[in-house]
């Protein structure tokens, strides 16, 4: 028997064994939501106890209750199919200036407060290991992203540009919770800074958005420098249950929140 069973199989087994008993409605909801996910997402979820999965999920959702209510959730799904309007601007953006914790590549950077404070945590940890982070890109307005995307289309053509640049309204940068670190080039991942961020970012709530080998899932080429702040609990949940792929977890959370109880 194949030892690599998916959570969905475990749920079906659980439901069959408890058919004559009162079933946890969250188990039934989990079954429906997982059936709606892509085959690749379902295949990424390891075998496990559905009730353990739900306990971890509820911990992540409880964390969301602490998010500010006057702005988008830190789990907000934005990608090629989900967008924000051209007028959306995160509330209370904080300027990201060069200081004793990090360097910057330009002087017009900013982040949502939650991401800013998480960057402080991440940067202090990096400094303790002898590394000073370089912050190269943060919040981008709809208009800024529009100009950037159009420039790339003119430079490389639409087909190629769409593989590495977001159309306006679909960029994580517009949410004010994403950072591009370092040189914004593939070789940055092999630098001391790049390796440190890759290995430690999740400890401080930062998740790699566009991993290598998942362009068909995320819609974008590998970007070793692009990290999104989602919080520590979500990073743990992502690693434990979604093969550490941010897109899978955010799609699941979006589907869960939209599904009927």
For the regions a language model picked out, list residue spans one by one.
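Bacterial N-terminal signal peptides
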Residues: 9-16
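Extracytoplasmic cell-surface/polysaccharide-interacting catalytic and binding patches
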Residues: 20-138, 142-261
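Intrinsically disordered, low-complexity segments enriched in polar/charged small residues
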Residues: 8-9, 233
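Positively charged n-region of N-terminal signal peptides that target proteins for export
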Residues: 1-4
């Amino acid at each position: 028997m194949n030892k690599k069973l998916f959570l969905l199989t475990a749920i079906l087994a659980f439901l069959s064994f408890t058919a004559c008993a009162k079933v946890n409605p969250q188990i039934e909801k989990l079954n429906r939501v997982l059936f709606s996910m892509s085959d690749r997402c379902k295949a990424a979820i390891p075998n496990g106890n559905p009730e353990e999965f739900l306990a971890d999920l509820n911990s992540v959702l409880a964390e969301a209750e602490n998010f500010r209510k006057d702005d988008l959730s830190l789990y907000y799904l934005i990608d090629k199919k989900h967008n924000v309007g051209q007028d959306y601007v995160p509330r209370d953006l904080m300027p990201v200036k060069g200081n004793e914790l990090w360097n910057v590549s330009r002087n017009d950077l900013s982040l949502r407060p939650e991401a800013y404070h998480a960057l402080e945590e991440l940067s202090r940890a990096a400094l303790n290991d002898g590394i000073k982070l370089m912050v190269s890109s943060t919040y981008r307005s709809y208009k800024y992203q529009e100009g950037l995307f159009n420039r790339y289309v003119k430079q490389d053509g639409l087909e190629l540009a769409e593989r590495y640049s977001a159309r306006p309204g679909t960029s994580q940068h517009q949410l004010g919770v994403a950072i591009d670190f370092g040189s914004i080039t593939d070789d940055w991942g092999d630098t001391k800074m790049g390796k440190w961020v890759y290995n430690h970012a999740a400890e401080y709530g930062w998740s790699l958005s566009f991993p290598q080998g998942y362009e068909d899932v995320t819609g974008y080429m590998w970007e070793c420098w692009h990290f999104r702040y989602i919080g520590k609990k979500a990073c743990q949940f992502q690693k434990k249950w979604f093969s550490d792929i941010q897109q899978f977890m955010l799609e699941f959370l979006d589907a869960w929140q939209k599904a009927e109880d």
